[in-house]
Regions:
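Metal-dependent amide/peptide-bond hydrolase catalytic core
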Residues: 248-447
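Divalent metal-coordination and catalytic microenvironments
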Residues: 43, 64, 90, 102, ...
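Acidic/His- and Gly-rich active-site-bordering loop/insert found
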Residues: 22-137, 146-163
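Soluble non-cytosolic domains of exported or imported proteins
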Residues: 30-34, 47-58, 142, 146, ...
Length: 447
């Protein structure tokens, strides 16, 4: 019996290294999926609005500690004092080597969920104005969180394949474009080191599960919020000649702004100017004293952004002068400092390198190069304005291929991100995100 036991022990010692050597990002993702799906469903059922991610951040901190990270909680300095510091950083060290930042976002949206899922959100919370709103993970940040935790678990078990320091960043308030800046303002790079690379991911509502999609160079836009007050001289609607009508003037200004896009801008430099809100007046027969407008302005290049914002101001005031508005009643144009998101730039060389890694891990047919979008993403803050930190934010598909084909055949649009009906397929989405992120980190930190 003793000899037999000794043989079993020797055999187990001989086999163990080979078992460990067989661990891969794919096998570890598969092994962790059941518990990660449970986390995903829990987070999906308990969404929290931007700046109020108390429960979510505590859950992420707990999981990062369990994955072997040294965790710091309650990071973030906001301009808005209503928001508490719910940023979380987990540091995983493995000797000398490069530092790689891995980021997830955590916040949800004021959307009334209509997916019909058994774990659908029923949460109602107070928004910034104190009003009750339904809350939903309508942008897939719950899938990001689960994949983020899965990545930390996998990289802990693959420490023999990498060296250096991984800084896991769980960021609040992405949806309002404030979270990344709040963490950097709180000394993220001073306290945890400026990374050599920064990586992020996001689910995509029109790409099939199992696929990674990525954009080279500019991937998302500068986002500026502009408030404009068009002033006039009000009066009776029957006597417009005795007034300076700000309603007609506002209409002229809106049309003139579109010439910035069509006639004053290089068509190879995308620009979007959208007037999302216009309000003025109180009654049918009263010409008001002012009209208020709210704009969103989207650009890529910093020099284009500066010129377009200046043009918006110039045209508004020029139209007012042409309408005979006194100089002391010129339009007031204000670019918000609270809701600005910089354009996201995927470093071309790093993107090329990681595309090769993903094709090897997932197959050539499962990696797509996609066009940039005019949406905003505050992951852009991590590469800094001078793009001095090579960064890539990639997408993972979240929709079943059969569903994509079904909607295409019917000529219908799939539920988009931020839709009350958006429901990613969790298992393959989260698995692909883990494999994508883990293989990227391993390549950048390989021994």
């Amino acid at each position: 019996m003793k000899i037999r036991s000794l043989l079993v022990l020797l055999l187990s010692l001989w086999v163990a290294p080979f078992i460990l050597a067989q661990q891969t990002p794919q096998s570890l993702a598969d092994a962790e999926l059941p518990s990660l799906i449970a986390i995903y469903k829990d987070v999906h059922s308990h969404p929290e609005l931007s700046g109020y991610e108390e429960r979510t951040s505590a859950l992420v901190a707990k999981e990062l500690r369990a994955a072997g990270c040294e965790v710091t909680e309650h990071l973030g300095k906001y301009q808005n004092s209503k928001y508490k510091a719910y940023g979380v950083v987990g540091v995983m060290k493995n000797g000398d080597g490069p530092t790689v930042l891995v980021r997830t976002d955590m916040d949800a949206l004021p959307v009334n969920e209509e997916t019909g899922l058994p774990y659908a959100s029923k949460v109602v919370a107070k928004n910034d104005e104190g009003k009750d709103v339904h809350v939903m993970h309508a942008c897939g940040h719950d899938t990001h969180i689960a994949a983020f935790i899965g990545t930390a678990r996998a990289l802990r078990k693959l420490k023999d394949q990498w060296h250096g320091t991984i800084v896991f960043v769980a960021q609040p308030a992405e949806e309002i474009g404030a979270g990344a800046r709040a963490l950097l303002k709180d000394g993220l790079y001073d306290r945890f080191g400026k990374p050599n690379f920064a990586l992020g991911f996001h689910d995509k509502a029109d790409v099939q599960t199992g696929h990674i999609a990525v954009t080279k160079a500019y991937a998302s836009a500068n986002v500026d919020s502009v408030d404009v007050t068009v002033r006039g001289i009000g009066g009776h609607g029957a006597y417009p000649h005795k007034t300076k009508d700000p309603v007609v003037l506002a209409a002229e200004i809106i049309n003139a702004w579109q010439t910035i896009v069509s006639r004053q801008n290089n068509p190879l430099d995308p620009v979007v100017i959208t007037v999302g809100s216009i309000h003025g007046g109180t009654k049918h027969n009263i010409i008001p004293d002012e009209v208020k407008m709210e704009l969103t302005v989207r650009t890529y290049k910093p020099e284009v952004r500066e010129r377009v914002l200046a043009d918006i101001d110039r045209i508004a005031k020029g139209c007012a002068a042409a309408a005979g508005i006194p100089a002391d009643l010129a339009p007031i144009v204000t670019v918000s400092k609270d809701f600005i998101t910089a354009a996201m730039y995927n470093d071309p060389e790093l993107t090329k390198r990681l595309v090769a890694v993903w094709k090897k891990a997932l197959g050539n047919e499962n990696v797509e190069i996609i066009d940039p979008v005019m949406g905003g993403e505050d992951f852009s803050e991590y590469h800094l304005p001078d793009h001095s930190i090579p960064s890539v934010n990639f997408h993972f598909g979240a929709v079943d291929a059969a569903k994509i084909a079904e909607f295409k055949k019917a000529g219908k649009e799939l539920p988009t991100l931020h839709s009350s009906k958006f429901a990613p397929v969790p298992e393959p989405s989260i698995r692909t995100a883990i494999v994508g992120m883990t293989t990227a980190v391993l390549d950048l930190m390989k021994k």
